[in-house]
Amino acid sequence: MTDRRKTVLLLGIACVISYSSASVAQDSLKKDDRIVFLGDSITAQGMRPTGYVTLTSAAIAKAYPELNIKVIGAGRGGHKVPDCQRRLDADVLQKKPTIVLIYIGINDVWHWTDPKVVASGRKGTTAEDFEVGLQAMIKKINGVGARVILCTPTVIGEKADGSNPEDEMLDQYSEISRKVAKETDSQLLDLRKAFLAHLNQHNSENAPKGILTTDSVHMNDAGNRLLSKLVLRALHVPASHVAKDTPKTNSAP
């Protein structure tokens, strides 16, 4: 394992969530909050009965039934930052959110290397366009009075030794997300650090998938539970409320 990789993993254990200048009280959930989850197929699948969005919604409803909080899924398969920019008004802003969680970046990287995507003539997102796009979306979201929780991308491959082909680029794009969160005074949820720390601890056989994902990218039940716990922590909701069985939700269309 490289020294750089060790540093990333140690940081992952030490710090996953960083907050804006607002206090924890200000970042806590409030009555009638509307939380939109903006992302790709990981978030689209997160709306399934055992998905991370559904688990998060159920935990919030259980912890704070009196707050009438709505959770809205806005994930679409294959989407990248430019795709999210194009549908931001229809899929996010028109839902009148008070909180928007942006979990994007996997396809922005993966579409540079995935053979099927490359063969089709499609491409990933340049680092510059990734950064500019995140900045633009956050500005529009803040403009309607909503706050942003910006996530770093998770994994494309679960090998814990840093040998997954896209690891270096994912680290680069994650650093961009961290930079954007800081510059826009947004809350950062560093999913990549958390996932790397988990895999370093639980993937002793250096398997390429099966610990947190079904196919090296999309979440299995363990991955969805971890995602939900991390999101709940960012929202200051007790993770003990994560349902083990199929939960009832308070999700909005």
Language-model regions: role of each:
Residues 1-10:
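Bacterial N-terminal signal peptides that target proteins for export
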